């Protein structure tokens, strides 16, 4: 990696590590699930979950459903579903957002591998990585927020990403941000 910062003193080589396109992976998993008989119920609010001998009864705002298996894929609202099933062992998701730079595919060759820094208490830290589509992705920050729907990007957050990414990788072509 010719663009590793001069200040970098150590590295961990993880040859089995890899990158995926999270959107493409999600669609592929959903397509595979559909081909295997999974029925999706979009725009439906779960109001209750009851364990049955052979599966689950799911109460929704569109009527009840029964399923052998329920996957809690509620994202930042997964705590609500968890707490319906395990009210004596509740969990709370603290929402967090992150700022990123996405650079044009012409910048994708700036690094050949995902460059992580030492993780902190808020996560994996800022990384610099090529994407499966040839772009360069830099980030994220990790900001606790109140609003589970909060997706704002801030100048301060982008400044933090720029500074932290520069500790690991030099000469990042940020002018190619898209």
Predicted regions, residues:
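Active-site substrate-recognition segment that forms the wall
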Residues: 48-50, 64, 69, 74-178
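Flavin (FAD/FMN) cofactor-binding and adjacent substrate-gating region
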Residues: 1-42, 47-59, 169-173
């Amino acid at each position: 990696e010719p663009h590793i910062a001069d200040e970098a003193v150590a590295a961990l080589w993880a040859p089995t590590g890899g990158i995926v396109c999270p959107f493409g992976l999600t669609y592929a998993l959903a397509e595979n699930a559909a081909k295997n008989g999974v029925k999706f119920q979009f725009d439906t609010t779960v109001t209750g979950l009851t364990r049955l001998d052979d599966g689950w009864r799911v109460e929704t705002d569109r009527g009840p459903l029964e399923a052998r298996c329920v996957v809690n894929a509620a994202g930042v609202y997964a705590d609500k579903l968890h707490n319906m099933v395990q009210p004596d062992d509740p969990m709370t998701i603290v929402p967090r957002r992150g700022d990123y730079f996405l650079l044009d595919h012409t910048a994708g060759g700036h690094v050949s591998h995902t460059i992580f820094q030492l993780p902190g208490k808020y996560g994996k830290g800022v990384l610099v990585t090529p994407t499966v589509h040839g772009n360069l992705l830099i980030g994220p920050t990790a900001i606790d927020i109140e609003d589970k729907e909060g997706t704002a990007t801030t100048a301060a957050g982008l400044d933090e990403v720029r500074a932290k990414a520069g500790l690991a990788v030099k000469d990042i072509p940020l002018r190619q941000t898209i």
